[in-house]
Amino acid sequence: MVHLSAEEKGLVTGLWGKVNVDDVGAEALGRLLVVYPWTQRFFDSFGDLSSAGAIMGNPKVKAHGKKVANSISDGIKNLDNLKGTYAKLSELHCDKLHVDPENFRLLGNVLVCVMARTLGKEFTPHAQAAFQKMVLGVATALAHKYH
């Protein structure tokens, strides 16, 4: 499991508190579906995903992105227990949804890009390293039931 120092935890928590979590989640999920189109197969019920514009404007993508972001918020509040925080979601994604765990890493990387775009110069290389470490921890926790 990934270990974040007190300084890294502070950076992650502080940066997450500066963004509109719902907007960041919606943009990250939308970008995931555009950049990695094979991930769309898990969202058949979302309607029109035929183009970047359709995806980014899709209300179901935005709503699910909000859920994803709220889940990230839960993880940020529990950085010392990511495995426990994501145990039920890991089970759901593994046993029922059959999501390839690599998709969690992809989403984490896209989230880092969205954070960088949103925060600009405030998202320093040091802050990025801390945030990248956090999303890796979340992805690892979500993939736990796959092992």
UniProtKB/Swiss-Prot annotation:
Keywords: Acetylation, Heme, Iron, Metal-binding, Oxygen transport, Phosphoprotein, S-nitrosylation, Transport. The modification N-acetylvaline is found at residue 2. InterPro entries: Globin, Globin-like_sf, Globin/Proto, Hemoglobin_b, Hemoglobin_oxygen_transport. It comes from the Eukaryota. The keyword Iron applies. The modification N6-acetyllysine is found at residues 60, 83, 145. Pfam families: Globin (PF00042). Residues 3-147 form the Globin domain. Red blood cells. The modification S-nitrosocysteine is found at residue 94. The modification Phosphothreonine is found at residue 13. The modification Phosphoserine is found at residue 45. The keyword Heme applies. GO terms for cellular component: blood microparticle; haptoglobin-hemoglobin complex; hemoglobin complex. GO terms for molecular function: haptoglobin binding; heme binding; hemoglobin alpha binding; metal ion binding; organic acid binding; oxygen binding; oxygen carrier activity; peroxidase activity. Heme b binds at residues 64, 93. GO terms for biological process: hydrogen peroxide catabolic process. Heterotetramer of two alpha chains and two beta chains. Involved in oxygen transport from the lung to the various peripheral tissues. Belongs to the globin family. This is Hemoglobin subunit beta. It comes from Scapanus orarius.
